[in-house]
């Protein structure tokens, strides 16, 4: 791993026997940066970034190239990060990577596609309205601290993205899509030296705006609001109980992953486990942690 001159972090993986190559770009900003007046803006930007760049202006050029060369591409917006990724036949990593790099150098964010993608985002929102898992997730947010960004609506809709949204989109991109907020991973059949040269050539032009990481100081739950109980009527005929424990950030312990140990212990399904006992008592037929 290394950093480019623009402070963009890079991890390279060389596999001479690979028949596929891949790359992923993670930006350390997500829906936590949505303006109060534009819930879902980070997700909307994720959609718009695929639709042409100055170097490759055709809105479908990137998708067509990846698909024509045996690959697929996608992206997702989470609370604290946004991730773009693709895989492609190993022989086509360089041209794919060049197209990919332009997302973070000179995207068009073309006005003529704003309304189309606004409706696409709204369709994603509507598709999950009757999904019990999403309904439960949304209901849980209602008891969180409204001052914490995690409590906000993040998908986006025709209402939250109404009007002239492009200036807000450009402002968000210009403010947060900075090289110092990005981490790139590239895997290919080329040697590490060749991969490094490729990345330096294509990604050194990503501007470094010295963006400061977002820090949310408000507690996830306000003092005195816990313990709390939510009773949610599901649309499907299912019964479940979910126990949620807010904990302090363990980001500094990413290597040890302490919460994974707790999760594995609680979720163990063998002899003497919590699930085994619940099954014996006729109280549960499954458990996940």
Specify the residue positions occupied by each region the protein language model found.
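Charge-rich, well-structured scaffold segments of protease-associated domains
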Residues: 3-8, 14, 61-214, 220-222, ...
